[in-house]
């Protein structure tokens, strides 16, 4: 059904809708540029050679530093190879290109340049005394595993400066470039297939470990954190034996390890999806399809509906290849994969609002009752009647709100709870939160604590643009940054502002984060109807 939203209603959330596109799809990019107002930058030595960064706002920035070789040509659909070295001092003052990707929205502005030579890392370092060993926080960006880049998250200055932490953000391959899985690829790489983006992340973690001293970092105190697909990336690393020992702590924001359409697919599922994708590009013959796909220009590789997101179902995600990823993240946690890894797990109170804004409203439609029922039957198939009985359209002001609640509860809130429960069964210490602040108030397009709303509270801005927050919300932002930084330092996120925050064996209590109220609640499972979702094994 067409949607008619007044001009005054559209203008106010426009910046936040762009932010939401970045957080969900990684869609919006701009040409890389050096930092404004930077002085003569510091020089340090890393694997490959010398680099010169920039000093901006009390933070040392080293941008676009290669941690692996180009992924083009014969390196397409292959594990990352070492980056070539260079002579002289390499400028590290501008972001590198993003990995090849599509744009999800018809009105998206020009994206930043893309290249298969995209495996570079941005490192943000606080001023610190010589000899200091700072904790390192490694951010994996979201974007449904089809979009995103490190350049979009270039405003961590307050977190870095005030928290005395290093923040490092690597690029990783996306879509078919990162997650194509075929038997012939597995045969060529010792069983590895469909995990190239995951291996890129691991290559970045090894690079950070090997070069930590160059930035004043502690290679043994590394915290993974990420949002949406970035959160699932953290989960995937928890389930990857090849990543063991590369990190010490983890924060999972709105990207749960349980019951998610982004969860690692089985090889059989991934082989079929990848074969269908290849056939759609004219590379159907099994004997020649790998050479056929490697010969295609990158732009042609993206000429497929699978390379962007049109529904809550996804095609591209890490694969359980039995080498890099050997089990589901939920099972890995229950089996003790995080027994010695402190975890923070969270979701937002109104996650579904973002997906209505980007998948429905931005395309000038709003679901009516028939659309809602049809969508539920397509997504939940045999469980659709149970979902529709629990979320009947008559129980909500509009069908759109019914859909929003289903997405929030089924795709994010309850999976976050199931992640926490699995980790605790495996002996992990876990703190769970629910972000419940509404940066846009009761806006009709992005109401409440929508998916991605917390990220500007962590980074203070995106795309080099500060995200203005009201004073109370900015105070919450500072508190979140203090908590995340303390977690990186100590393995415990509990601060005076976030106390008490139950952990260990307490499976029912969640820290509710709002500008006006920070409380511990025991109603999370009831509010989000997690009894329904507990026996729906896979969503999407």
Question: How would you label these PLM feature ranges?
Answer:
Residues 2-38:
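Secretory targeting and sorting signals
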Residues 36-195, 312, 370, 381, ...:
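Non-catalytic accessory segments of hydrolases
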Residues 101-286, 290, 307, 323-359, ...:
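Serine-hydrolase-like catalytic core of hydrolytic proteins
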Residues 173-175, 225-229, 434-439, 499-505:
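Short, solvent-exposed turn/loop segments enriched in Gly/Ser/Thr/Pro and often Arg
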Residues 258-261, 298-472:
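Substrate-gating cap/lid region and adjacent catalytic-acid/histidine neighborhood
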């Amino acid at each position: 059904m067409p949607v008619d939203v007044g001009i005054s209603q559209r203008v106010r959330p426009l910046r936040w809708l762009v932010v939401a596109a970045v957080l969900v799809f990684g869609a919006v990019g701009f040409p890389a540029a050096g930092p404004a107002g930077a002085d003569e930058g510091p020089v340090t030595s890393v694997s490959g050679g010398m680099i010169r960064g920039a000093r901006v706002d009390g933070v040392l920035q080293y941008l676009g530093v290669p941690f692996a070789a180009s992924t083009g040509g014969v390196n397409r659909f292959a594990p990352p190879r070492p980056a070539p070295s260079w002579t002289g001092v390499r400028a590290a003052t501008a972001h590198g290109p993003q990995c090849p990707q599509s744009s999800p929205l018809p009105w998206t502005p020009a994206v930043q340049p893309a290249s298969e030579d995209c495996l570079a890392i941005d490192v943000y370092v606080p001023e610190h005394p010589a000899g200091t060993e700072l904790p390192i926080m490694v951010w994996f960006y979201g974007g449904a595993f089809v979009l995103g880049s490190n350049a979009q998250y270039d405003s961590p200055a307050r977190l870095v400066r005030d928290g005395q932490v290093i923040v490092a953000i690597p690029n990783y391959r996306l879509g078919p470039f990162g997650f194509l899985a075929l038997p012939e690829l597995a045969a060529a790489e010792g069983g590895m297939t469909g995990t190239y983006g995951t291996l890129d992340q691991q290559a970045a973690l090894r690079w950070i470990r090997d070069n930590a001293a160059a930035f004043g970092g502690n290679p043994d105190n590394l915290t993974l954190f990420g949002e949406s697909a970035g959160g699932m990336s953290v989960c995937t690393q928890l389930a990857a034996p090849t990543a063991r020992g590369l990190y010490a702590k983890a924060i999972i924001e709105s990207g749960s390890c349980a019951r998610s359409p982004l969860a690692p697919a089985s090889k059989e599922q991934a082989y079929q999806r990848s074969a269908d994708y290849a056939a759609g590009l004219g590379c159907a013959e099994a004997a020649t399809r790998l050479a056929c796909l490697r010969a295609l220009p990158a732009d042609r590789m993206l000429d497929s509906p699978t390379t962007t997101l049109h529904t809550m179902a996804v095609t591209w995600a890490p694969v359980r290849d039995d080498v890099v990823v050997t089990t589901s993240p939920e099972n890995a946690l229950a089996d003790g994969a995080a027994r010695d890894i402190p975890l923070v797990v969270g979701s937002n109170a109104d996650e579904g609002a973002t997906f209505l804004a980007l998948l429905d409203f931005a395309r000038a439609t709003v679901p009516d009752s028939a659309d809602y029922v049809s969508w539920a039957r397509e997504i939940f198939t045999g469980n659709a009647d149970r979902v529709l009985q629990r979320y009947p359209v008559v129980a909500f002001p509009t069908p759109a709100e019914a859909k929003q609640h289903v997405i929030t509860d089924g795709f994010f809130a309850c999976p976050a709870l199931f992640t926490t429960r699995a980790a605790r069964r495996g002996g992990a210490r876990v703190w769970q939160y629910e972000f419940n602040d509404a940066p846009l108030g009761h806006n009709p397009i992005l109401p409440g604590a929508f998916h991605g709303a917390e990220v500007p509270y962590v980074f203070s801005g995106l795309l080099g643009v500060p995200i203005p927050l009201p004073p109370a919300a900015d105070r919450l932002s500072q508190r979140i940054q203090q908590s995340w930084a303390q977690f990186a330092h100590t393995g415990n996120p509990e601060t005076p502002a976030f106390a008490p925050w139950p952990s260990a064996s307490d499976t029912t209590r969640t820290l509710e984060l709002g500008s006006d109220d920070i409380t511990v609640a025991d109603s999370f499972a009831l509010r989000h109807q997690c009894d329904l979702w507990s026996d729906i094994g896979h969503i999407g």
